[in-house]
Amino acid sequence: MKVEIFCDGACSGNPGVGGWGSILRYGDTVKELSGADGDTTNNRMEMTAAIEALASLKRPCEVVLTTDSQYLVKGMTEWMSGWIRKGWVNSKKEPVLNRELWERLLALSKIHKIRWAWVRGHNGHPENERCDELARAAIEVFKGRKP
């Protein structure tokens, strides 16, 4: 099955309360997911949006995952193999941040065939804008306010 995933993360303070939002589209079906965390970073929320969307798929899929996070796209397409080869240290010889999330993404990428795509954030891309709305609404719900 072919699936389009769009995802975004947001933080109120960085670190701070964060939210994530994802849209999954397959055939005529569109599904929206979102959530929040009380103490996180924008990068962790970007990654969580992708993880939750991929984890929600019931069987192996062909996925195009679109995000405005260069950190996420470059991590999965350029940096991951080097981190693994070097024992999860980065080019500065420091432990890779968010390793547990990268490892979850790696495991999910072995289940699904994923093409990682980057789009400029806050630039009028409808699905990216909607994911941002979902992420920000999740922050407000977490804080106890109506979105």
From Swiss-Prot:
UniProt-listed Gene3D superfamilies: Ribonuclease H-like superfamily/Ribonuclease H
Positions contributing to Mg(2+) 1 binding: D8, E46, D68
Keywords annotated in UniProt: Cytoplasm, Endonuclease, Hydrolase, Magnesium, Metal-binding, Nuclease
PROSITE patterns associated with the record: RNASE_H_1
GO molecular function: magnesium ion binding; nucleic acid binding; RNA-DNA hybrid ribonuclease activity
GO BP term, example: DNA replication, removal of RNA primer
Cofactors: Mg(2+)
Enzyme Commission number: 3.1.26.4
Co-factor binding comment: Binds 1 Mg(2+) ion per subunit. May bind a second metal ion at a regulatory site, or after substrate binding.
Binding site for Mg(2+) 2: D8, D132
Keyword Chloroplast: no
Subcellular location per the Swiss-Prot or TrEMBL entry: Cytoplasm
One GO cellular component term: cytoplasm
Predominant location category: cytoplasm
Catalysed reactions listed for this entry: Endonucleolytic cleavage to 5'-phosphomonoester
Source organism superkingdom: Bacteria
Job description of the protein: Endonuclease that specifically degrades the RNA of RNA-DNA hybrids.
Assembly information from the UniProt record: Monomer.
Sequence similarity: Belongs to the RNase H family.
PANTHER family: RIBONUCLEASE H1
HAMAP family: RNase_H
Protein name per UniProt: Ribonuclease H
Naturally occurring in which organism (per UniProt): Geotalea uraniireducens (strain Rf4) (Geobacter uraniireducens)
